[in-house]
Amino acid sequence: MDDQPRLMHSHPGVGMAGHPSLSQHMQDGTGANEGDVGRKQDIGDILQQIMTITDQSLDEAQARKHALNCHRMKPALFNVLCEIKEKTVLSIRGAQEEEPSDPQLMRLDNMLLAEGVAGPEKGGGSAAAAAAAAASGGAGADNSTEHSDYRAKLSQIRQIYHTELEKYEQACNEFTTHVMNLLREQSRTRPISPKEIERMVSIIHRKFSSIQMQLKQSTCEAVMILRSRFLDARRKRRNFNKQATEILNEYFYSHLSNPYPSEEAKEELAKKCAITVSQVSNWFGNKRIRYKKNIGKFQEEANIYAAKTAVNATNVSVHGSQANSPSTPSSAGGYPSPCYQSDRRIQ
């Protein structure tokens, strides 16, 4: 009996706690758990390092980059990334088709070019002003002043457009250069082909093109507002000078019973007013409509022109009668004054 404890003590593997297989399994389990904990800790450290990248200074980032480039496992890492890239590049190639030009942007470009805003300055505003002058049928001082004002405002719009366009192009070029340099720098660590850099540049340009389209659209709207204000042909046709309006009103009220001038009369009025025959026809058509709608309002104007016509007719009649009658005898000149003698004979 005394030898039994001695035997059990001399053979520690005997019993539940000292069984060799159980002891080995317990040791292996402990090692596996320690390995899992170690791997999780390594992943946690890596994630923590990634999260602190944005907080690093430029010198720290350069030092880590240099350490990565000098690491002995760097080529192996690059090869693994290339293999992954080869597997995924096939799905990307299908989406690299060139998109057609935006038709709206092309229309805006054509309009700005036609108005003389885009492209070299070659008098686009002057051409538009000259066209409006031809449509209005006159090149008086008022028209010249308005056309000069139009050209000045168009030049201002052009200057603003080119200034903003230059800012846009500068910002686009700076951002594109920054992205290209960044991709070239990253290509030392991960595989980036020149085609991918070109694709990224085209994406950037498409993003910036929306800003360019807004600029061109607002400029076109400003030009259209300017044209409607200064070069509207219908407004020009209504704005005859005072002398032309007087001539047309005088003819209208002197022929109020039949205010429909013949073609010969229209041509004569057009020459006097320095406007076109079609403008004369339009003026009389509008005048007849306004007169019929507001007869009472235009009655006073009709009386004024009737009185003026009567005065002119009286002056013409007086001058005509004086020209046709013989001169009145007088002692100062003309016929000699008769002299009565005592014998009552006129000598």
Swiss-Prot record:
CDD domains: homeodomain. Keywords: Activator, Developmental protein, Differentiation, DNA-binding, Homeobox, Neurogenesis, Nucleus, Transcription, Transcription regulation. Residues 45-124 are annotated as: PBC-A. One of its GO terms (biological process) is neural crest cell fate specification. Its main location: nucleus. One of its GO terms (cellular component) is nucleus. Residues 233-295 bind DNA. Residues 127-232 are annotated as: PBC-B. PROSITE patterns: HOMEOBOX_1 (PS00027), HOMEOBOX_2 (PS50071), PBC (PS51978). Shows broad, weak expression from blastula through gastrula stages. At stage 14/15, expressed in a broad arc that gives rise to the forebrain and eyes. More intensely expressed in the lateral neural folds (presumptive neural crest) and as horizontal stripes in the posterior neural plate that give rise to the hindbrain. As development proceeds, expression progresses posteriorly along the neural folds and at stage 21, expression is pronounced in the prospective hindbrain and in migratory neural crest cells. InterPro entries: HD, Homeobox_CS, Homeodomain-like_sf, KN_HD, PBX_PBC_dom, TALE_homeobox. It is found in: Nucleus. It holds the Pfam family Homeobox_KN. The keyword DNA-binding applies. The displayed sequence corresponds to the ortholog of the mammalian isoform B sequences. There is currently no X.laevis ortholog sequence for isoform A. Forms a heterodimer with isoform 2 of meis1; the interaction is necessary for neural fate induction. Belongs to the TALE/PBX homeobox family. This is Pre-B-cell leukemia transcription factor 1.
